[in-house]
Amino acid sequence: MNRIGGVVAVAVLLVSGCGKKEPGAPSAKDAAPVSQVDRSFSTESLIRGVRLYQEYCAQCHGPEAQGHPDWQNPQVVAAPPLDGSGNAWKRKKQDLIAVIKNGASRQGEPVMPAWKDRLSDQDIDDIMTWFQALWPSDIYTRWRKDNAAGATPKG
């Protein structure tokens, strides 16, 4: 529980404007300049999101959403990062939701379980809120603007 409390504290700090950017992380601003969007996440949603993430997602995606080190290796079934350093931000919101609900497979083999029978729509939204709070501001801004416009984020 102490680790979850620490993760919640980090998420709250990120929400309050103290975002982190890992060296070498992909940057949406390289694709096109965008002005920042509001990053006001509900504290309750963040708390629920981190709790649910730790229960259902952390085993594969890592306790801090960092993903498996071999996530880019096509020879390895490894969960990608959800902290903004992977490709999740390049997906439309409805695509992220569909993957969480229905799972994912590669060459017909399941690589992520379907959570539609265990997680409600609100649970999924809270989990996404938590990991999106970890995204660098430029990436989150790009994702929000592209989703509002109906475009697939590029980068």
Language-model segment annotations:
Residues 2-9:
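Sec-dependent signal peptide recognition
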Residues 64-97:
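Gly/Gly-Pro-rich "capping" loops immediately C-terminal to redox-active cysteine motifs
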Residues 21-52, 150-155:
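Electrostatic cytochrome c docking/interface patches
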Residues 52, 135-141:
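Short sequence/structural segments immediately N-terminal
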Residues 41-66, 73, 96-98, 155:
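Sequence/structural segment immediately N-terminal to covalent heme-attachment motifs in c-type
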Residues 40, 90, 118-119:
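Short, conserved sequence motifs enriched in acidic/basic residues, glycine, and aromatics
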